[in-house]
């Protein structure tokens, strides 16, 4: 297939990005005294946050809801792990240099815990907390940092996990949420800075063996895939990747939400997304009231991420409980206010509508009219499976620009998720799989639905059985506590954030081990 001019321009830009990153890390000689460039380590050596012996992981996991599920999978730690807080230089969406931070987790000990080790680059999921620091494994809300240290670093992987621009020590007032270009640069720069920090003074025997694995969950699944795409385009080595439960088919996902399939974190998601794309492209709205209802329009551009807890923002009225009005924009959209199928997710969709809502009916109507005029090929019906050909709505244009149905991997990929996910719908995984089957048949892609039946000679039988048992335990606990819906609501509440991650991350670890 011939490359379009657009693809060639992207390829050239990415190559220049990587080259600039390498140049600024000392791979080229020169006497410039300019400020540190992309990928530069801003604090050398990086600060040590904590060191954890193998036995300590059992205690930490036992006090964590995700960790408790991991322990049920016969988990054991092998290596001591030293966690460093890294600070590095990256760029904002406009290409301006900006500082960011993250974690570097270094294993040590005997055997595979020392010497040349594989690198695991991890992209975390959606965070509303501006102070989020994945290097602080003891912080409330940092399940991902703990799980990455336990599943990968304590098993001999060097783990690099950026916080992203907009969090922790970052000076940017917003987060470039689901901005494929900026977020992939952030990941690449965190990786470059971490590699320059190795070997560390604390663990001098652990080095990078040249093998790179990329994974991420939820928002991080999207970021992981965008990063893989960017690195592949630049000719950088990626050994294997495992994007997990991510919104890869972003244009289809956006259409699904506006057409009544409102996911369970839609208010938070759209608040972050609007700030991201308005800052990146400048054309999402002229005034925030073009999209958002009063009284939310005035503060929405800088509301998230916040140092105020998301629950407080919801309880004090800074954010509404619903995304859309329960009154449809017109009678033509009554069947989508809310959507009723698939039936198991109908209660989630219904919760996205109410008398107090974020998005005006006028804006929802204009979005839906554009979706009808230029439909996505993957939603509501699967036609060609491609993003919309010519959207005129600015949000739909931005979603198409960041949609990942545009490339094919040359390194092995595992896609993992659960078919009843109420947060990131599983059709994202299916559309990505189908796109690659049609457009990149040489790609080596494995797809795992942890919520599916065990098949004959199923290599993931134990994970599927474990997931079913974990889901049944949530149901039972809910019923014992008085639930009258057979525990359905409890399962949906835990599905994306608690039930799926330990199983998909365990699958990713096994997948990567085969290429290590």
Regions found by a protein language model. Give the residues of each.
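C-terminal catalytic histidine-bearing segment of alpha/beta-hydrolase fold enzymes
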Residues: 255, 391, 395-398, 420, ...
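Short beta-strand/loop motif that positions the catalytic acidic residue
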Residues: 409, 414-421
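Primarily recognizes the serine-hydrolase "nucleophile elbow" in alpha/beta-hydrolase
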Residues: 192-265
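Accessory cap/linker subdomain of secreted extracellular hydrolases
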Residues: 247-406
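Alpha/beta-hydrolase active-site loop
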Residues: 177-200
């Amino acid at each position: 297939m011939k490359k379009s001019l657009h693809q060639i321009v992207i390829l050239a830009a990415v190559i220049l990005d990587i080259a600039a990153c390498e140049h600024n890390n000392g791979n080229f000689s020169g006497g410039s005294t300019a400020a540190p460039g992309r990928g530069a380590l801003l604090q050398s050596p990086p600060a040590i946050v904590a060191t954890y012996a193998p036995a300590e992981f059992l205690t930490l996991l036992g006090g964590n809801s995700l960790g408790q599920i991991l322990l049920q999978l016969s988990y054991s730690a092998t290596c001591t792990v030293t966690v460093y807080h890294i600070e590095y230089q990256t760029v904002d969406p406009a290409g301006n240099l900006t500082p960011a931070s993250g974690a570097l987790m270094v294993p040590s000990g005997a055997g595979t815990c020392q010497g040349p080790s594989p690198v695991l680059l991890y992209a975390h999921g959606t965070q509303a907390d501006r102070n989020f620091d994945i290097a602080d494994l003891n912080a409330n809300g940092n399940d991902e940092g703990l799980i990455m240290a336990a599943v990968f670093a304590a098993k001999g992987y060097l783990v690099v996990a950026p916080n992203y621009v907009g969090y922790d020590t970052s000076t940017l007032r917003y987060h470039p949420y689901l901005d494929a270009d900026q977020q992939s640069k952030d990941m690449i720069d965190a990786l470059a800075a971490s590699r320059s920090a190795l070997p560390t003074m604390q663990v001098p025997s652990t080095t990078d063996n040249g093998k790179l694995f990329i994974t991420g969950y939820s928002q991080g699944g999207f970021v992981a895939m965008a990063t893989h795409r960017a690195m592949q385009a630049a000719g950088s080595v990626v050994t294997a990747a495992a994007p997990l439960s991510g919104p890869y088919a972003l244009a289809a996902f956006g259409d699904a939400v506006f057409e009544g399939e409102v996911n369970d974190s839609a208010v938070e998601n759209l608040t972050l997304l609007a700030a991201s794309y308005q800052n990146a492209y400048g054309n999402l709205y002229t005034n925030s009231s073009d999209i958002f209802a009063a009284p939310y329009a005035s503060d929405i551009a800088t509301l998230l991420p916040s140092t105020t807890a998301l629950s407080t923002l919801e309880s004090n009225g800074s954010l509404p409980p619903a995304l859309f009005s329960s009154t449809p924009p017109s009678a033509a959209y009554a069947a989508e206010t809310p959507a009723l199928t698939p039936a198991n997710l109908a209660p989630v969709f219904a919760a996205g509508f109410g008398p107090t809502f974020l998005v005006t009916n006028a804006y929802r109507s204009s979005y839906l009219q554009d979706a009808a005029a230029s439909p996505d090929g993957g939603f509501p019906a699967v036609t060609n499976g491609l993003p919309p050909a010519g959207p005129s709505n600015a949000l739909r244009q931005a979603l198409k620009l960041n949609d990942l149905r545009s490339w094919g991997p040359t390194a092995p990929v595992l896609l993992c998720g659960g078919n009843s996910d109420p947060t990131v719908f599983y059709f994202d995984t299916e559309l990505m799989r189908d796109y690659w089957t049609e457009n990149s048949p040489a790609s080596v892609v494995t797809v795992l639905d942890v919520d599916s039946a065990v098949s004959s000679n199923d290599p993931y039988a134990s994970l599927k059985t474990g997931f079913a048992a974990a889901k049944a335990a949530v149901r039972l606990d809910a019923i014992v506590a008085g639930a009258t819906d057979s525990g359905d609501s409890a399962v949906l509440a835990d599905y994306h954030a608690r039930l799926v991650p330990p199983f998909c991350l365990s699958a990713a670890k096994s997948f990567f081990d085969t290429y290590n």
